UniProtKB/Swiss-Prot annotation:
GO terms for molecular function: protein-membrane adaptor activity. This is Protein GET1. Residues 25-110, 173-213 are cytoplasmic. The gene is GET1. It is a multi-pass membrane protein. Residues 41-68 form a coiled coil. GO terms for cellular component: endoplasmic reticulum membrane; GET complex. Signal peptide: none annotated. The chain crosses the membrane at residues 5-24, 111-131, 156-172. Interacts with GET3. Keywords: Coiled coil, Endoplasmic reticulum, Membrane, Transmembrane, Transmembrane helix, Transport. HAMAP family: Get1.
Amino acid sequence: MPSLLLVVFILQFLLHIINTVGASTVNDLLWILYNKLPTPTSSSAQKAQKLKKEIVQLKRELGATSAQDNFSKWAKLDRQHNKAMAEFQKIDGSLRGHQTAFTSAVSTLRWLGTQGLRFVLQFWFAKSPMFWMPAGWLPFYVEWILSFPRAPLGSVSINVWGIACASMIALAAEGLAAVWVLATKRPTPIATEKKEAMAFAADQKSSGEKKEL
């Protein structure tokens, strides 16, 4: 059985990812993966994608065909486009209904597996110490805060451990984001900086001459 410390950390990490990416984005990705599997909606989703490409291609051909110069070809393309569009709208409407039900089920399961599980763990292990602090290291009021709400005095409660994990994950994410920005940022060429400085100096000089006049 995995350690409770690790379970709480993984749970906070998943919550951070969901909050950063967004619940709607997670739902959309899961819907795409669901349609990649042999599910009841996979064939309809593939057909909808095929029709979507066909509609785009027909639109391009319609735009490149003159209705005055080649009316028969234009009319044929227009009929094909309307037929494909009607079929696509029918399939898309059915898929949207399935997606709404899928999103509702996924949202419920996601809440139960993250927030719901966190509440259950905090309630069930409220009196269980995550780990003990060395005796005499901290003042009484600090030990009381670390053991809040019902853990033994001198230990760290599951609530405090969860807050600590969430804070560490957030700080680590901000640090990685800052490193990524610094690593991918292109340095400004020195020649460009000199040109900008000269242009700024020239502007200041011209404005000073205007004031004297």
